[in-house]
Each structure stands twice: as C-alpha cells, then as structure tokens.
Amino acid sequence: MAGCAARAPPGSEARLSLATFLLGASVLALPLLTRAGLQGRTGLALYVAGLNALLLLLYRPPRYQIAIRACFLGFVFGCGTLLSFSQSSWSHFGWYMCSLSLFHYSEYLVTAVNNPKSLSLDSFLLNHSLEYTVAALSSWLEFTLENIFWPELKQITWLSVTGLLMVVFGECLRKAAMFTAGSNFNHVVQNEKSDTHTLVTSGVYAWFRHPSYVGWFYWSIGTQVMLCNPICGVSYALTVWRFFRDRTEEEEISLIHFFGEEYLEYKKRVPTGLPFIKGVKVDL
C-alpha cells in the first residue's frame, strides 16, 4: 500500500487535505478571471498551472502527495459546481462530478479523523481497482455518446433528482457507518484481530450488518441514475451486487473467527441491508 513515509502530528493530514481541497475548489472563482479578459480555456490552464506550482513550492513529499490529490478532488468539485449551474445538457454531469469528488475526498478525511493509524494515500480510494476505473470510464463514455445522439435522454430531471437523492442517502449512510465504527473501520478486510478491535452493533449497525457497503451500493447505482445512463445503470447494479455479495462473505468469515458466538447472534437478528444478500452461510 502507498502511504506516508513519516507520521505527521495527529490531525495534520486532515488539516492539510482540507486546506488543499478548498484551494482546488477555488476554481469557482474562474468566471471572475474570464470577465477580466482571460479566455475560458486559457484561464483554466493558467489556473491549473498556478495551483500545481504553488503546491510544489509549499510542500515536499509525502505531504505533496496528499496535497495534490486533495487539491485535484477540490478542483473537480469546483468544476462540477460550475457545470451544475450552467445552462447546458451537461449540468447533471456536474452533479456527478461533485458527488464523485466528495466521495473520494471524504473517504480520506473521515479516515484521517476517525482512524489515523490506518491512513494512507490509498484512503482516497482513487486507485481502488482496475474494474472500478473501467466502470467509471464506461459511464463517462455512455453519458457523452447518449448526450450527443439522444440529448433528450439526459434531460429527465425527475430521474436525475432521484439519483441524486440515492447518492446523498448512500454517502450519508456510509460516513455514518465509518464514524460509528471508529477505529474498527478499515478499507481493507482484516484477517487478524487487533487488540482494540471490537464488534460494533450500535447506531447504523443496529439497522444493517454492513451499513458502509449498503451506502456504497446505493451511492454507486445512484450515480448512474443521476446521469440517466441505462446501460451502466443496469451493469453497475449487477456488478456491485456481485462484488458486495463476495465481500460480505469474505468479511463475515473473519468476523466469525474474531468474535465467534457473539457475531453469530448479531448475524441472526440484523440483516446485511443489501438486497438478496444474506452473508456467509454457517452450518451449525
């Protein structure tokens, strides 16, 4: 796993990431530059170059690696916000850009606050997997092609709003799960129990056994509903369902090993929260 070479003072990564995320989001001021006489593309290129030069001047590795990622996500959020308020058929893609950047940035920020011992550059989840990258690129390609050839398909506002609500619900549920689990939450399934590892059954974990997966499940499908992507909408639903089916089974094998009868009792009374997924089968 990629990570920080030296451990900084507690909370410094969170503050650094927040400051540089906001710095990237300051691209929202770009319309002011265009009014001052700069052309849109020229202004954008100069802005990006200026941001990168500033980060190179202020930070050295490994802090630069944190800063450049957070700043990039802030930049995407700012561009998405500008696009959201534009009078174009791409406005809903702006919603998507904001949702995507906030998801990845908040994964890092919450981990930095909640469980700094497990924090690394991988906490941004930007390099989650090849499959994740291919899925994202496919959704962008589908939106672009359909927006060119069937633009009316991208103007179903009520459907995009439904997708946005799914995204907000999924994001809030996942972050609530991360905060509730505290130091017990980790982006990687653990095969060895740490001394501080406890079974969390309160809060959102009293509703679902895997609330962070439930949140991510509805968030990912919601992004495609928001984009009015019929092909990726169906393929995302099937793919993430299969992924979380396998993931919950893998995780529950470890949890049963860690907590034994305590987890089995919890498993009996609380559902996974994922449709048609019951978790690992246990022969008693």
Curated annotation (Swiss-Prot):
Its main location: endoplasmic reticulum. The keyword S-adenosyl-L-methionine applies. S-adenosyl-L-methionine binds at Q190, H197, T198, L199, V200, Y205, H210, P211, S212, Y213, E251. Gene3D superfamilies: 1.20.120.1630. One of its GO terms (cellular component) is membrane. It is found in: Endoplasmic reticulum membrane. The keyword Endoplasmic reticulum applies. It catalyses: [protein]-C-terminal S-[(2E,6E)-farnesyl]-L-cysteine + S-adenosyl-L-methionine = [protein]-C-terminal S-[(2E,6E)-farnesyl]-L-cysteine methyl ester + S-adenosyl-L-homocysteine. It is a multi-pass membrane protein. Residues 1-16, 60-69, 113-131, 175-212, 245-284 are cytoplasmic. The chain crosses the membrane at residues 17-33, 42-59, 70-87, 93-112, 132-149, 155-174, 213-228, 230-244. It comes from the Eukaryota. Substrate binds at R247. This is Protein-S-isoprenylcysteine O-methyltransferase. It comes from Homo sapiens. The gene is ICMT.
